[in-house]
């Protein structure tokens, strides 16, 4: 289930961290390996790096992460009840298979902090598609941009609906990507999506 995960290497123990071996991470903190800020900052960083310094092997790894780990796993697809929702801790596999049908299980998609990391990743994938069309990426530039915008829209709407957690009053890592995403939506002639995101962003 975690095929494509961007893993970390523990230099001290020479172990690659993953759901089959959390190494020195124990208890509830195992989330650090796959999700939350520790897990989701890695694709945000790698995608930002690839815009400035493209590398085909790294782009392929990021693409595998998106196609096999994020879309339909970590993040809800457009065919699910809450499109673009992002699963929280301990990991999406546990939550999707939970017997709890509510916000502590299958609807644990209310953590506002998770959304900007993934939105930034998609925005950078959009830029990579535009700047370096030869890189091995599975989706179109338009698809990545739409996902970036709709991930931010989901950040403002899904947590508020499910758990009364508002993204309007808290500063979030990587949320300033919204400014660039709005400019890109205007450039790509997506006025309806731009207006919807702009209303939410301006309110904040």
At which residue positions do the language-model features occur?
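Catalytic cores of extracellular degradative/oxidative enzymes
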Residues: 1-204
